[in-house]
Amino acid sequence: MRCGPLCRFLWLWPYLSYIEAVPIRKVQDDTKTLIKTIVTRINDISHTQAVSSKQRVAGLDFIPGLHPVLSLSRMDQTLAIYQQILTSLHSRNVVQISNDLENLRDLLHLLASSKSCPLPRARGLESFESLGGVLEASLYSTEVVALSRLQAALQDMLRRLDLSPGC
């Protein structure tokens, strides 16, 4: 008797049943832990304590502040902008934070896909190239303001993750 695909499936069944999907609660906990880690890294950079995240600095309006509604797509967009800014600073202080933001964005995509709302990969600022002069003229100020605002945004994201944000 020929069993073909059925026999192969039954032979693979023990292996297939062993594979488990990552529980969404674990992904959410990992996301929160990574946010706390990034906030701690920002706190460890001593010069970021001098500026309030709400302070307005002329020429640095492209750095996002807090948003009233933070959906998963808005969180990803905000993190993409911060990642683009930090990468352009070429500072030793922010290399690991930039890498952590990439990992955080991946976790947000996992959370979104678990809610059946896959996020398109968000891009950073489209007019970012025109800001090169601002960045070169004020690297230190840009770093301080960006890290301060990023820290506030991450703390807000941490609070909102408990409320199970929408797509």
From Swiss-Prot:
One of its GO terms (cellular component) is extracellular space. Gene3D superfamilies: 1.20.1250.10. It comes from the Eukaryota. InterPro entries: 4_helix_cytokine-like_core, Leptin. Disulfide bonds join C117-C167. It is found in: Secreted. One of its GO terms (biological process) is regulation of nitric-oxide synthase activity. Keywords: Disulfide bond, Obesity, Secreted, Signal. Residues 1-21 form the signal peptide. GO terms for molecular function: hormone activity; peptide hormone receptor binding. PANTHER family: LEPTIN. Belongs to the leptin family. Key player in the regulation of energy balance and body weight control. Once released into the circulation, has central and peripheral effects by binding LEPR, found in many tissues, which results in the activation of several major signaling pathways. In the hypothalamus, acts as an appetite-regulating factor that induces a decrease in food intake and an increase in energy consumption by inducing anorexinogenic factors and suppressing orexigenic neuropeptides, also regulates bone mass and secretion of hypothalamo-pituitary-adrenal hormones. This is Leptin.
